[in-house]
């Protein structure tokens, strides 16, 4: 097992809901990403999801699209993201890091080179939003050769052979998209999420993480009650957008928001234990 698999397994054994915050690398500026990563770990993150900025992030709503634009305006590249992970690893060799991005930058380097450089930097998993599992073999083979976990999205409409393909190809965890549409919009239907998560669990022993639509501690707790991991992105990135003129405040503000979610999730574990 690699670092991500070990962490997810440890959380499950401890009855701890894994908390996975997302930030876009290079936002609000490249110099702020590594300190922000450490701040999120200090606030209770179990895994970090680091977005690779891309010019056409089709699965993302306006909040993360704007974050990508800010990062790209600073000239943030894929290899800059690798360097950020490398610098994070100088102080933290334990917290798993998952890269989330789109296929074009990966194809530009080629699956083998991408996987080698990602692993060398200290990356543990890769979620390529627009990579269908049926076409993923060259990528998953390169990832396997470098002990990287391929992570795939399961949408509310995913069923049958597609769901089976995702569960067969994934490592680390399966990422269930809680809402139809892009990130940061719509309301959560926790009863429906519970049914969909059960359908995924019927096909795999992997933990199921749920993301898209989690806005605060209350919604994190509601989702955490039915999932193994809670993934939060737009709610954090939106706070960054409000602090672009005061970027030095970003780590503390995001740590406070994430800490509230951590406490809400830990409250679930205490309820189960009692």
UniProtKB/Swiss-Prot annotation:
Gene3D superfamilies: Aldolase class I. It is an enzyme of class 4 (lyase). InterPro entries: Aldolase_TIM, RibuloseP-bd_barrel, Trp_synthase_alpha_AS, Trp_synthase_suA. It catalyses: (1S,2R)-1-C-(indol-3-yl)glycerol 3-phosphate + L-serine = D-glyceraldehyde 3-phosphate + L-tryptophan + H2O. The keyword Amino-acid biosynthesis applies. The alpha subunit is responsible for the aldol cleavage of indoleglycerol phosphate to indole and glyceraldehyde 3-phosphate. Belongs to the TrpA family. This is Tryptophan synthase alpha chain.
């Amino acid at each position: 097992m690699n670092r991500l698999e070990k962490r997810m397994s440890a959380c499950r054994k401890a009855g701890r809901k894994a908390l996975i915050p997302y930030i876009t690398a290079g936002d609000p500026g490249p110099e702020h990403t590594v300190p922000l990563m450490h701040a999120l770990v200090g606030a209770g993150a179990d895994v970090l999801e680091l977005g690779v900025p891309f010019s056409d992030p089709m699965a993302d709503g306006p909040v993360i699209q704007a974050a990508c634009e800010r990062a790209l305006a600073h000239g943030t590249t894929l290899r800059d993201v690798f360097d950020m992970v490398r610098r994070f690893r100088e102080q933290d060799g334990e917290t798993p890091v998952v890269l989330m991005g789109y296929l074009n930058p990966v194809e530009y380097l080629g699956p083998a080179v991408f996987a080698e450089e990602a692993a060398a930097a200290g990356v543990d998993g890769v979620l390529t939003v627009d990579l269908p599992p049926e076409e993923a073999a060259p990528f998953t083979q390169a990832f396997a050769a470098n002990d990287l976990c391929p992570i795939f999205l399961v949408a509310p409409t995913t069923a049958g052979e597609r769901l089976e393909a995702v569960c067969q190809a994934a490592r680390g965890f399966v990422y269930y998209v809680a809402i139809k549409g892009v990130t940061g919009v719509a309301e959560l239907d926790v009863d429906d999420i519970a049914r969909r998560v059960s359908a995924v669990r019927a096909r795999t022993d992997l933990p199921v993480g749920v993301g898209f639509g989690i806005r605060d501690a209350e919604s994190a707790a509601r989702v955490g009650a039915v999932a193994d991991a809670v993934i939060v992105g737009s709610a954090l990135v939106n706070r960054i957008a409000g602090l672009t003129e005061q970027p030095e405040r970003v780590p503390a503000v995001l740590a406070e928001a994430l800490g509230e979610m951590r406490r809400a999730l830990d409250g679930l574990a205490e309820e189960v234990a009692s």
